[in-house]
Amino acid sequence: MKVYGVVMAGGGGTRLWPLSTSRKPKQFLNLSGKETLVNEAIDRLSGVAQETFIVTNASQAQEMLSQTAGRVPEDHILKEPAARNTAACIGYAAMTILKKYGDVIMCVVPSDPYTRDEEGFRQTLKSAVAAAEETDALVTIGIRPTFPST
């Protein structure tokens, strides 16, 4: 079954102020010294997803196209009709991909996490994809919590 990556990158730039602003939200920052966060997320999906989509808001779509030039086709940059957070973002991507490609596996990642072990993360994604294929179920991955937090 084909695997499509989805990068959630619609944040408004409010959580990492003053580095991140509404004019330059976190996903467009280069915090590692290598790439912008959104491009690192796209790269993280390589070897797992055959194609990658980015969900962003309409006001950031042009900058997203510029920032991801050559990595993601223009029609793979999805503009959220309204900012409604994670569930709506994933639902919008799922409906768009379902209409275009039918029943596939979607691998959804945020644009802004720090990932120390890129290859280990990629292997975890591959295991999750295999589990989804095998069980025809929703698979989630995450870190084991060590304390309660929001």
Where are the language model's segments positioned?
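Conserved core of the sugar-phosphate nucleotidyltransferase
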Residues: E118-T150
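Conserved N-terminal catalytic core of the sugar/cofactor nucleotidyltransferase
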Residues: M1-V7, R15-P18, N30-P110, R116-G120, ...
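Short glycine/proline-enriched turns and hinge-like loops at secondary-structure junctions
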Residues: L19-S20, T150
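Conserved beta-strand scaffold positions in the cores of enzyme catalytic domains, especially
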Residues: F28, I77, L138-T140
